[in-house]
Amino acid sequence: AELQNHRNELKGKVVYCNCDDPTSSNFVRYLCDNFNAYGLKALIATHYIDPQTSTQKPVKLTVSRADNAEGFIRELTTLEGDGDFRSEECIAILNSADIVITNPPFSLWRDFIDLIIASNKTFILLGTIHAINYQSILDGVKAGKITTGYTNFNKTLKFAVPEHYDGKTTSNTTKYAEVHGICWWTNLPVTNRKPLQLSKFYSPDLYPKYEAKNTKGKPTATAPVDAINVDRVADIPCNYDGLMGVPITIIGQLDYNQFEVVGKLNNGFIGDKKVFSRILI
């Protein structure tokens, strides 16, 4: 559903899925099924295989447009290396692509997004809302260049995991884990954001400022930031022009014409209570 909103941006482009086994990835299957519908120029998919646990070599799938506009050509080749997205082999493929669409390993998400941004590539990535903790994502959000996607935001989804991972097991013996706060991240335009309709009014009693305390709750000379605390996005006061700390879920509703993101607060205190991480607007 997410990709349907980016048809114009996908048309005529080389898409790279660099964390996807061509034989089993739902991303690859979907893009192959919709190769002509989206007007892709080419689709490339590679994946990682740990050489310590498997003697198999990872494969590379290349799908390209046939001379017949109604068809396409599929080619499977063996990679020389282990298929790690950070390898020279996979970075060379990345450099030849236009758009990266994949579900990076959550444990390597920071490394992945840093590489993609450094490569100056367009991306549509499945991740979690907590990626806002990564400096490269926060910088992109502050600059208005990165945001979450169109699709229903902040969901819990199940992901298949290797046998040695902690997780649950389905009826067909596939092990999976539940991951909370799932969302899409992209640097493509997301045009469905509208200004929030705000109806609450500021008062010091309802919107206290953060205490002058350090990360352990000990008193300090100054507060970490001169901002009021807002516990819910719906409670943002309509008549306050100063700095506000709001829930990170605002990213999924943010209209950059209404608010400017200036930073993030990780360890704010209201009285003796430590509040959840806040986006500063």
Per-region residue spans from a language model:
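Class I S-adenosyl-L-methionine-dependent methyltransferase catalytic core
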Residues: 1-281
